[in-house]
Swiss-Prot record:
Induction: Under normal conditions on SDAY medium (Sabouraud dextrose agar plus 1% yeast extract), hyd1A is increasingly up-regulated from 562-fold on day 3 to 1742-fold on day 5, and maintained at high levels afterwards. Hyd1A is the most active at transcription level under normal culture conditions, followed by hyd1B, hyd1E, hyd2A and hyd2C in order.
Disruption phenotype: Leads to complete ablation of slender rodlets on conidial coat. Significantly reduces conidial hydrophobicity, adhesion to insect cuticle, virulence via normal cuticle infection and dispersal potential. Does not affect radial growth and multiple stress responses. Impairs significantly conidial tolerance to a wet-heat stress at 45 degrees Celsius.
Keyword Heme included in the entry's annotation: no
Phylogenetic placement of the source organism: Eukaryota, Fungi, Dikarya, Ascomycota, Pezizomycotina
Family: Belongs to the fungal hydrophobin family.
Disulfide-bond pairs as recorded: 39-109, 47-103, 48-85, 110-128
Domain of life: Eukaryota
Purpose of the protein: Aerial growth, conidiation, and dispersal of filamentous fungi in the environment rely upon a capability of their secreting small amphipathic proteins called hydrophobins (HPBs) with low sequence identity. Class I can self-assemble into an outermost layer of rodlet bundles on aerial cell surfaces, conferring cellular hydrophobicity that supports fungal growth, development and dispersal; whereas Class II form highly ordered films at water-air interfaces through intermolecular interactions but contribute nothing to the rodlet structure.
GO cellular component: extracellular region; fungal-type cell wall
Protein known as: Class I hydrophobin A
Gene name tied to this protein: hyd1A
Source organism per UniProt: Beauveria bassiana (strain ARSEF 2860) (White muscardine disease fungus)
Record-level Gene Ontology MF annotations: structural constituent of cell wall
Length: 136
């Protein structure tokens, strides 16, 4: 009885373990069109550089984000986490270009509307998600 339980537990653990295959496209082979599909209709593709910002405690833009070590800029981006982000234009001619050729750093999906959080007890706006975390 215990042997059967041990074998059943082992089989369940092996089948539940994540595989090395992501199921989706590799980030290095992803085109701008595929990245745009991953982002969705209400988001745009941004290329985020290394973290070059510094936290200024006297700035009005640092609220709770400043306490957590992230500066929320005027555009609503968490600059400390993703760095300085610039929008990658996706037009008809560039849809087939590889994402890696357009952005050698971190690519992210960001909301088109400015992310602003006001009037609540905890005001935290998270407008961007790294594209690498969307690939499964």
């Amino acid at each position: 009885m215990r042997f059967a339980l041990a074998i059943t537990t082992l089989i369940a653990a092996v089948t539940a373990a994540p595989s090395g295959h992501h199921g989706g496209k590799d980030l290095h082979k992803m085109t701008l069109g595929q990245a745009g599909d991953r982002c969705g209709a209400d988001q745009s593709i941004y290329c985020c550089n290394e973290k070059t910002t510094k936290i200024e405690h006297s700035s009005p833009e640092t609220g709770l984000g400043g306490l957590l070590g992230a500066t929320v800029g005027a555009d609503g981006l968490l600059s400390h986490l993703l760095g300085t982000c610039t929008k990658i234009p996706v037009n008809v001619l560039a849809v087939g270009n590889l994402l890696q050729s357009e952005c050698t750093n971190r690519a992210a999906c960001c909301h088109n509307t400015p992310s602003v959080a006001y009037g609540g007890l905890v005001n935290l706006a998270l407008p961007c998600v790294a594209i690498g975390s969307l690939i499964q």
